[in-house]
A protein has these predicted regions:
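Core catalytic lobe of class I
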Residues: 1-229, 234-237
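Short, conserved SAM-binding/catalytic segment
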Residues: 1-2, 240-253
């Protein structure tokens, strides 16, 4: 078993092989899903966006995401059996899946249900999107599936949890792109929302696609153990720095 409370700068397919069967209590992850890419899998310029070739992302040359092109589907499909293997029975796998014209959520839901028991598609309402044209992306999805063999691990029996996460009452806000360190960075509070529902203090949370470390920070702040993998050294270094900052903030209080 790998050492806990660490981010590993390596391919998650290789790293997962070093995790014992039935040893993880919860997975929350944001895999590459082709967000903001053109047909070549490249983040595109403002001019290309204006010509209808995709959605503009600032600083594209420094913010590219590995394996975020057409290969994203295949990578996710290959990961499903490994995520299932390491999870304990009754535990949940929560996967962010974007929101947009590509019905990726439909494909991924069906693939998850072939191995897990598909539980729900959660809609994260990101609030008003401002000025624009055509359909604006005001939501993203999170797919929740559980490993069969035991009752679903659910740790909030006092509230009816809607399948729409609305920012006005959950305290979860959309990250302003210019302030994000990763092009698809999620709010720490979003990860906390799922971590608290599907795990307890001291249990282990896994993020195979850690990016800039949001899931790991949320796990740390909620007193969970964690393991994360990130292939790209650029993002792994940023995640490590964010984790160290979170650790220092914790010791202040």
């Amino acid at each position: 078993m790998l050492e806990l409370n660490r981010l590993y700068n390596m391919d998650c397919m290789e790293g997962m092989k070093m995790i014992d069967d039935n040893s993880i209590d919860m997975i929350f992850t944001d895999p590459p899903y082709g967000h903001n890419n053109n047909n070549n899998g490249d983040l595109i310029s403002r001019r290309e966006a204006a010509l209808g070739k995709g959605e503009y992302v600032p600083d594209r040359d420094n913010r590219a995401i590995m394996n975020d092109g057409k290969e994203a589907d295949e990578i996710f499909k290959q990961m499903i059996p490994e995520m299932h293997r390491v999870l304990k029975a009754g535990c949940c796998c929560c996967c962010c899946c974007g929101g947009g014209p590509d019905p990726m959520f439909a494909r991924w839901s069906l693939w998850l249900d072939e191995v897990f028991k598909f539980k729900q598609m959660i809609v994260w309402d990101k609030g008003p999107m401002g000025m624009g044209w055509h359909y604006r992306r005001s939501y993203e999805t999170v797919l929740v599936a559980m490993k069969k063999g035991a009752a679903c691990k659910w740790y909030d029996e006092t509230h009816a949890i809607e399948n729409i996460i609305r920012p006005r009452y959950k305290g979860i806000r959309k990250i302003i792109p210019s302030k994000a360190q990763h092009p698809t960075q999620k709010p720490v509070e979003l990860a906390k929302f799922f971590i608290v529902l599907h795990s307890q203090e001291g249990e282990t949370v896994l993020d195979p696609f850690a990016g800039s470390g949001t899931t790991l920070i949320a796990a740390k702040q909620m007193k969970r153990q964690y393991i994360g993998f990130e292939l790209d050294k650029q993002w792994a270094d940023i995640a490590t720095a964010r984790l160290e900052e979170a650790k220092n903030q914790t010791t202040l209080f």
